[in-house]
């Protein structure tokens, strides 16, 4: 019995080993598989599923029926988290729906209230159909020009109005001498204030010749009638009174400033007479050399074209075109100085770097009937209101019109809108009547 029992147990153990070797290895039990099995037990159709008789023997077949998905996808969030997410989503939706129409309404209101602004456009070239180019004037230039012209006419207190180069010739001189005097005044005016130029011109009119000034040249019937009236009455036709102890000028003498006296005077003497102007040493050389050229090449009269005038030493485009207008009455170009160059750029008419560029730009579109007056117009504006430093925008007629792109807004008028206070300066530029002209300088 014992021997048979030992044989049976040994046989059973060997049989178990063989079966164990032939059967597949048991599947490893993990946390996810255990959770899946647990969830499978709570499935909706768990009670209706028939038990497989082989389930107990083969555990792997039951696990393969469960989808291998992440636990976060199977489990529903807790009530608190679900409520928080739902509320935040609702809040986001409500905020987005609340803000969107507000933005749209604001945009619509802005579009309705906004008015199209007039664009300020400078002078520009426009190509025509035939391939040629024309220059269109800046926008609103005529409105700016009209306002400034009216303002200057109502208050002509700038130094250029009474002491500009066009006003400094001797009224009783011959036309040839007056043209020469205008040229000399322009040559002296470079880098010099009008008041200083007027004083230097007065010295040349009265002190240039040696041994006294020559007798006056009577060239008009008006002058002859004045002399005849003086001879009959035994006294001057127009009585003059001394001012500040200075006796009035004697109208019986002509100016000493003429070509012949400039040629005869020594450079040292001429330099002392014009010593108040800027760069007087260079100007002395230029005037002496120009006088020789006028005598030798132009029959003792100044040239009659801008190109010929610019051949004279010290004479540039500005002087040439101003001299053509004042001396010959020919307006062939615009005299552009620093005031014209600066102010037109402040207005946005163009973007130029030099006065010569400004001249060419203005001449391309400005009507020719304004070429002569624009210099005096803008120089006076630059001397009284639109100053190089410390512009008085409150005193300008363009204030508040939105026409000047460089206006300093909020500036109150410094003189109640009446321009600058007047200061009287007596400069004897003796006319035929012998009355000294009263010059007005704005402080």
UniProtKB/Swiss-Prot annotation:
User: What cofactor(s) does the depicted protein rely on?
Assistant: [4Fe-4S] cluster
Tell me the organism. Answer: Emericella nidulans (strain FGSC A4 / ATCC 38163 / CBS 112.46 / NRRL 194 / M139)
Q: Where is the composition biased (Low complexity)?
A: 86-98
Catalytic activity, as annotated? 2'-deoxyribonucleotide-(2'-deoxyribose 5'-phosphate)-2'-deoxyribonucleotide-DNA = a 3'-end 2'-deoxyribonucleotide-(2,3-dehydro-2,3-deoxyribose 5'-phosphate)-DNA + a 5'-end 5'-phospho-2'-deoxyribonucleoside-DNA + H(+)
Q: Where is the HhH domain?
A: 297-321
State where [4Fe-4S] cluster binds: 386, 393, 396, 404
Indicate, by first and last residue, each region the UniProt record lists as having compositional bias (Basic and acidic residues).
99-114
What's this protein's name? Endonuclease III homolog
């Amino acid at each position: 019995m014992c021997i048979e029992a030992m044989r049976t147990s040994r046989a059973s153990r060997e049989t178990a080993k063989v079966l164990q070797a032939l059967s597949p290895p048991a599947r490893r039990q993990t946390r996810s598989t255990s959770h899946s099995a647990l969830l499978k037990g709570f499935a909706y159709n768990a009670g209706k599923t028939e038990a497989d008789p082989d389930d107990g023997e083969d555990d792997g077949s039951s696990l393969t029926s469960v989808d291998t998905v992440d636990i976060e996808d199977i489990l529903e969030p807790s009530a608190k988290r679900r409520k928080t997410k739902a509320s935040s989503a609702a809040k986001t939706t409500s905020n987005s729906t609340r803000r969107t129409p507000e933005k749209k309404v604001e945009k619509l209101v802005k579009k309705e209230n906004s008015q199209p602004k007039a664009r300020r456009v400078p002078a520009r070239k426009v190509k025509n159909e035939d391939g040629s180019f024309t220059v269109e004037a800046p926008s609103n230039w005529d409105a700016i020009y009209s306002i400034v012209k009216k303002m200057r006419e109502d208050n002509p207190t700038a130094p250029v109005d009474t002491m500009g180069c066009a006003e400094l010739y001797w009224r009783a001189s011959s036309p040839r001498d007056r043209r020469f005097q205008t040229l000399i005044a322009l040559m002296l005016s470079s880098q010099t204030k009008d008041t200083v130029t007027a004083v230097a011109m007065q010295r040349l009119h009265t002190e240039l010749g040696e041994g006294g000034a020559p007798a006056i040249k009577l060239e008009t019937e008006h002058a002859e009638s004045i002399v005849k009236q003086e001879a009959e009455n035994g006294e001057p036709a127009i009585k003059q009174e001394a001012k500040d102890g200075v006796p009035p000028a004697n109208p019986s003498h002509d100016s000493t400033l003429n070509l012949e006296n400039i040629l005869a005077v020594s450079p040292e003497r001429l330099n002392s007479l014009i010593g108040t102007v800027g760069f007087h040493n260079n100007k002395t050389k230029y005037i002496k050399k120009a006088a020789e050229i006028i005598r030798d090449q132009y029959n003792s009269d100044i040239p009659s074209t801008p190109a010929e005038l610019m051949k004279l030493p010290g004479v540039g485009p500005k002087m040439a075109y101003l001299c053509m207008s004042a001396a010959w009455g020919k307006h062939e170009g615009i005299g552009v100085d620093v005031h014209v160059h600066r102010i037109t750029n402040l207005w946005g008419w163009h973007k130029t770097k030099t006065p010569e560029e400004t001249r060419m730009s203005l001449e391309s579109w400005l009507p020719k009937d304004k070429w002569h007056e624009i210099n005096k117009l803008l120089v006076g504006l630059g001397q009284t209101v639109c100053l190089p430093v410390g512009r008085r925008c409150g005193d300008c007629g363009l204030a508040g019109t939105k026409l000047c792109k460089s206006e300093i807004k909020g500036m109150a008028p410094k003189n109640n809108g009446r321009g600058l206070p007047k200061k009287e300066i007596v400069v004897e530029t003796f006319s035929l009547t012998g009355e000294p002209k009263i010059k007005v300088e704005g402080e």
